[in-house]
């Protein structure tokens, strides 16, 4: 029999105290270690916010377009610095995308039966190449071609300075070195015992891989037929010369 007090606790509606979840925020989202990189940790200013630190380092803390609350800094002549919107930002809603649409007149092509708009005809869409109508300024339909070439000149000096800061260059060099290290990684070599095991399988079953996979004595770990094929193919390649 259990104690009466313990039974009352089990029936109580008072929530039990849950163990503290390390690495998780109050909102339930996973806590991200922004100082996981040694270069960023060395240049991180704890007095600044995450957005301010990333802007100072020349990085971006999110790809989505800002929806408000961004900091507007005054320039030397007393005006407010207007940060131009990055055209590569991900739009969060259709309303935000509609605000970017230029107002004007254009021609449309409608379906003669339903009256629905099939396509919008603009002045620069009159060129036809290979049976397809393309823009004269973008015959290959490159989505990045529509970005302004003078975009860098329109940005403020503070943003242009951070575009290729020394920290960004260090991070790029680090990423390049890690990529080269992965490419130069030596492949796994089969051990002597693995080669002896493969030889015993071939001596007993020949090229019958399905029988090898079903063999409980020689294949106690129940390696699959495809895995055995890959191991034997690698063994043959090493012993062919």
Swiss-Prot record:
GO terms for cellular component: nucleolus; preribosome, large subunit precursor. Component of the pre-66S ribosomal particle. It is found in: Nucleus, Nucleolus. Keywords: Nucleus, Ribonucleoprotein, Ribosome biogenesis, rRNA processing. Residues 1-30, 64-195, 209-241 are annotated as: Disordered. Residues 155-172 have a biased composition (Polar residues). Residues 70-89, 106-122, 209-218 have a biased composition (Basic and acidic residues). Residues 230-241 have a biased composition (Basic residues). Belongs to the NOP16 family. This is Nucleolar protein 16. InterPro entries: Ribosome_biogenesis_Nop16. Coiled coil: none annotated. GO terms for biological process: ribosomal large subunit biogenesis; rRNA processing. The keyword Nucleus applies. Involved in the biogenesis of the 60S ribosomal subunit. The keyword Ribonucleoprotein applies.
